[in-house]
Amino acid sequence: MGNAALRQLAALESVAFDDISGSVIAVDAHNWLYRYLTTTVKFTSDAAYTTESGVEVANLIGVVQGLPKFFEHDLTPVFVFDGGVTELKDEEVQERRVAREEAVELQAAAEERGDELAASRLEARTQRLTETIHETTRGLLNRLDVPIIEAPAEGEAQAAEMAIRGDVDYVGSEDYDTLLFGAPYTVRQLTSKGDPELMDLQTTLKNQNLTREQLVDVAILCGTDFNDGISGIGPATAISAINDHGDLWSVLDARDEFIQHADRVRSLFLDPPVTNEYTLHTTINPDMDAARSYVVDDWEVPADEVERGFERIETSVVQTGLDEWI
């Protein structure tokens, strides 16, 4: 379901950092990294975010700049990384790849005609999370002693499962699909200035007079990352149809419509591949020297791009006591 459509249904409210202080947040690593990656590329020179051999390391700058926001508000992040891409999501991945390739061509044209503003905007659209980006991010998080969980499939689904089990307090993601995966509470806008936004699953269901299963059915009718929706159906129409007919199958029968792999899509949200075999530590004891050396020496990031962030991490971890006990 498109983010704009699902946002219309979600129960959202601004929440002060003080109100969630002391919490553990399962962060959708892919979602968080992508936002910092595109932002870093916009405001950082090429020399700062690529090595001499051309390897992109903007993610390391993003991690160092982004982590202090958690620590300064006494929040413990747990980064949940995606596993393999599900077969049903391959088409979306291909579409994103095509969009990136088109953006690369447009960026080159903008640079050729000297339009620096357009080139800068297009550059952010060309970003992708490579295996090197994932591995270097893991390397830095490990040196900072930030917990990492490897999901068998969708990171959002794994993060939601951890919240359902009570192992974490919130899921951290900008994606509204966390509602469909059953996350009780999602904290949004963790990469933005100002206070975050809290998304509440039970209030969403109550406000829309839906069960979670019916919310998933509404999403499938509108379209998700795993399927195309029914033409002409938006969230209001989908809710009305579900209220009238009860579930997805009855709506499809009544409208004489068909959604390919609808049963599998439904299962991916309601019974996704997740694991309960993980060890979660919430005591943060970063090796700052090792982290600095990894970023500056091993990956050639200019020290002046990250030193302020490292100082904030060091200060905030000690001040909040994250290195002792959460």
Swiss-Prot record:
UniProt cofactor note: Binds 2 magnesium ions per subunit. They probably participate in the reaction catalyzed by the enzyme. May bind an additional third magnesium ion after substrate binding.
GO biological process: DNA repair; DNA replication, removal of RNA primer
Residues annotated for Mg(2+) 2 binding in this entry: 175, 177, 225
Annotated region (Interaction with PCNA), positions in chain: 318-326
Keyword flag Magnesium: yes
The entry's keywords: DNA damage, DNA repair, DNA replication, Endonuclease, Exonuclease, Hydrolase, Magnesium, Metal-binding, Nuclease
Region (N-domain): 1-100
EC number: 3.1.-.-
Gene Ontology MF term list: 5'-3' exonuclease activity; 5'-flap endonuclease activity; DNA binding; magnesium ion binding
Name of a matching Pfam family: XPG_I
UniProt xrefs under SUPFAM superfamilies: 5' to 3' exonuclease, C-terminal subdomain, PIN domain-like
Disulfide bonds: none
Sites where the protein binds Mg(2+) 1: 28, 82, 154, 156
Keyword Kinase part of the UniProt annotation: no
Essential cofactor(s): Mg(2+)
Residue ranges of the region described as I-domain: 118-246
Subunit structure: Interacts with PCNA. PCNA stimulates the nuclease activity without altering cleavage specificity.
HAMAP family: Fen
Similarity-based family: Belongs to the XPG/RAD2 endonuclease family. FEN1 subfamily.
Role, per record: Structure-specific nuclease with 5'-flap endonuclease and 5'-3' exonuclease activities involved in DNA replication and repair. During DNA replication, cleaves the 5'-overhanging flap structure that is generated by displacement synthesis when DNA polymerase encounters the 5'-end of a downstream Okazaki fragment. Binds the unpaired 3'-DNA end and kinks the DNA to facilitate 5' cleavage specificity. Cleaves one nucleotide into the double-stranded DNA from the junction in flap DNA, leaving a nick for ligation. Also involved in the base excision repair (BER) pathway.
Name of the featured protein: Flap endonuclease 1
Originating species: Haloquadratum walsbyi (strain DSM 16790 / HBSQ001)
